[in-house]
Amino acid sequence: MWKKKIVLSFLFYLISALGISLTIQAGIGVSSFNAFNVTFATLTHLKVGTVTTAINFAFLGTCWLLDQQRKIQDYLIILVALIGFGFVINFFLYQLFGSLVFQNYLVKIVLFILGTIIAGIGTGQVVALGVLQFPIEKFCTLISERTRYSFQFYRYLVDIFCVSLALGLSIGYHSPIFVREGTVISLFLLVGRESGGNSVFYEYKSRNWNPNERISVFFK
């Protein structure tokens, strides 16, 4: 059963990465965390998946330092999943979708919504299985446990920081701005927040959320 959960968790982790790739490919802006990733990747000429993995590594390392109940096995599994996560984003963005250009704005909207839904469902399944965690959400959980502020408070702070940094870099270096209408759309599509996903699922999980309800609460 444990091995099956690990395999399924990896699968849905990668499905989430596929969804994120679609939102980026749509070209109408991305969620807060991904806005920073794409902006930084554009400025440094690195691949988006590589940047996403590197930043998640940084959060995971911080979690390791904060987590008093850390288990090497759990962190190694997340580490491997993050590598696959970045690889899938790079594969879809630069190989499978690399030559695709969408001119029709309605098509872009549909593609973005589809990607957001896929990413959210993948994330919800990962959290429901309870094997893998997403570094940013884990970081916010660990911080909230040590302070009087809630998980949501810190998750919003991360979002605000990412958006502010993305805008600052774009304006300062005169590069494309990725905080656009897609960023707003993502907030209305998901109940709560996403990071290429996702804190809402942690909130429900922490309240003994029934996994069978995950689809019904995913949409507003």
Predicted regions and their residues:
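Core subunits and conserved enzymes of cellular information-processing
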Residues: M1-K220
